[in-house]
A protein has these predicted regions:
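PRPP-dependent phosphoribosyltransferase catalytic core
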Residues: 340-401
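Short amphipathic alpha-helical/adjacent loop interface patches that line ligand
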Residues: 73, 331, 382
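A glycine-rich phosphate-binding loop feature that marks nucleotide/adenosyl-phosphate handling sites
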Residues: 155, 252, 329-331, 394-399
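Short, well-ordered amphipathic alpha-helices
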Residues: 16-21, 98-100, 334-340, 382-386
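Short, internal active-site loops enriched in acidic
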Residues: 92-95, 332, 399-401
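Hydrophobic, well-ordered secondary-structure elements that form the walls
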Residues: 311, 324, 334, 378, ...
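A phosphate-binding catalytic loop at a beta-strand-loop-alpha-helix junction
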Residues: 322-341
Length: 401
């Protein structure tokens, strides 16, 4: 029988994480860890660390939060595969402290990005100062040299960036074959400084002289020597992806070589574009859309859930069979996103969600709806996802041996 897409463990994550392999019966490391920890708004943390910070004393409150997070991040590092990555959502209250802490636990050189996520497009209207409209996503590798995270997405490709159309209907754009970065030049990359031949009338390009072709060497706009982005063997292999054109530069008209950069390289596969470090609500969803999608499943029972679109974008950077861990599971967004992504692309991702039995606030929508603890919300959502999206669900006891 196939493993379910979603597994839930109720318990304090500091107790659960060291025994997670024993609890799940699987020692394999995790490819992706995502967490959305408490944002340190001044309330006590619902974890049994015997750590408390005075809400009025800023320094001690930050110290208490960091002390709460440190052992959990260390445990997460130990559970990560060497090729894996961790992503942590955070707001301005602790973004600076979290970054320093993760630099210490994972290594500054392992930091892959600090993404600004536009979760509140209207901006927070309460309080003084600017109307804050974003949070952050800090992303670190366990070993950046081996990390398999692919920071690109097919969804970020804008067809308007590809204005040219080939006779067969394929869209493309012209990119200079010349490397435009002056760090790469005949001194630093001598093997990429060579001449090719092109005919600006027909557009044809070859590595050797032909017909009415003219010799073209790579130069910068000011006429200084440059290098190509492609090696000579690659030009021999893909001459039809190149075109020779006349252009006007600072030194007057000249002949140059361009690459046809295709929107779709073949009939079955599209192209991917590097993700920027600003993620808009229109792309990944907002807090409002997250509340709405949770309301459809279990009701309006959680104040600030994350949208599944945010997690699906993150999941899209990892292999489609990734093992995923969320040990601040909250409303269960990560597990929901895993199921949606698997259903969309045929992947076999599996997610383990851990959440404590933190009591819901007295008089809150969640308590009125019958959810005594936040873990009850997590459980209800993941069960509902299994029923509606598929993939199965299991709950494991944190006390099993």
């Amino acid at each position: 029988m196939a493993e379910p897409w979603n597994t839930f463990v109720e318990g304090d994550n500091l107790d659960v994480l060291p025994r997670l392999a024993q609890i799940t019966g699987e020692a394999a490391p995790y490819d992706l860890v995502y967490i959305d920890p408490p944002y340190n708004t001044g309330n006590d943390f619902a974890y049994r660390d015997d750590i408390r910070g005075d809400a009025a004393a800023g320094t001690s409150r930050h110290e208490a939060w960091v002390a709460m997070m440190r052992p959990r991040l260390e445990q997460a590092r130990d559970l990560l595969a060497d090729t894996g990555a961790i992503a942590v959502s955070i707001d301005d209250n602790e973004a600076a402290h979290l970054r320093l802490l993760m630099d210490e636990v994972y290594g500054e050189g392992q930091r892959l990005a600090q993404v600004a996520v536009n979760l509140n497009p209207k901006g927070r209207q309460l309080g003084k100062g600017f109307a804050t409209s974003h949070e952050y996503l800090l992303v670190y590798a366990k070993d950046a040299r081996r990390c398999v995270l692919d920071a690109s997405s097919a969804e970020t490709v804008d067809e308007r960036d590809f204005p040219q159309t080939a006779p067969d209907g394929r869209r493309f754009r012209h990119l200079p074959l010349r490397n435009t970065n002056k760090k790469f030049n005949p001194v630093t990359a001598p093997t990429l400084h060579y001449s090719v031949w092109g005919d600006p009338e027909t557009g044809e390009v070859r590595a050797e002289p032909f017909g009415a072709a003219v010799e073209v060497a790579p130069v910068f706009g000011d006429g200084s020597p440059a290098v190509w982005r492609w090696s000579r063997p690659r030009i021999d292999e893909r001459p039809d992806d190149l075109v020779c054109r006349r252009i006007k530069g600072r030194a007057g008209e000249r002949v140059d070589i361009f690459q046809r950069d295709w929107l779709h390289r073949d009939e079955t596969g599209g192209r991917r574009k590097k993700l920027t470090t600003i993620w808009l609500a229109a792309e990944v969803g907002s807090t409002d859309t997250a509340v709405a999608e949770l309301k459809q499943i279990v009701g309006h029972v959680f104040e600030s859930p994350k949208p599944t679109g945010l997690l699906r974008r993150l999941l899209g950077t990892m292999p489609d069979d990734a093992r995923v861990l969320d040990f601040f599971a909250g409303s269960g967004t990560t597990g929901h996103a895993v199921a949606l992504q698997n259903a969309a692309d045929g992947g076999t991702r599996r997610c383990v969600s851990v959440n404590s039995a933190e009591p819901t606030r007295i008089g809150s929508n969640a308590q009125v709806a019958g959810y005594a603890t936040v873990a009850d919300i997590t459980r209800a959502r993941l069960q509902a996802v299994a029923d509606t999206v598929g993939g199965g669900y299991q709950e494991l006891s944190a006390g099993c041996t």
